[in-house]
Amino acid sequence: MAKQRTYSQHALEAAVLMGVQIKLGRKQRRWSEKNLAERAGISRATLQKIEKGDMSCAVGLVFEVATLVGVKLFESDSMPLSKHIEHTRDKIALLPQRIQTSKKAVRDDF
């Protein structure tokens, strides 16, 4: 039996929002499900799952379909995504490479 994954309400709503935005973009372009699925290289059933906000869909597929129909993946501002990536990687470089948990013994003999 497959293990059932649980998600926060916020994550579920975000997936549904992405799905309806994709569906809106597809319909605004007057593309059928079959047409968009062929453009994305996926099955029509997978596209239907994406448009419903199914959390089991691969994030790469969701991003690709969203891009095809013109859904903005991140806030559009003056900085292109490549600059956002570089900026975020610079921030990561300032942080420790390893996160170590403290192994202090708990003193509960009070």
Where are these regions (language model features)?
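Short basic helix-loop element that most often maps to the first helix and adjoining turn
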Residues: 20-35, 64, 95-101
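Localized chelating/binding microdomains
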Residues: 21-24, 30, 36, 73-85
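DNA major-groove recognition helix of helix-turn-helix/homeodomain DNA-binding modules
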Residues: 58-75
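Short, charged recognition helix plus adjacent turn
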Residues: 76-110
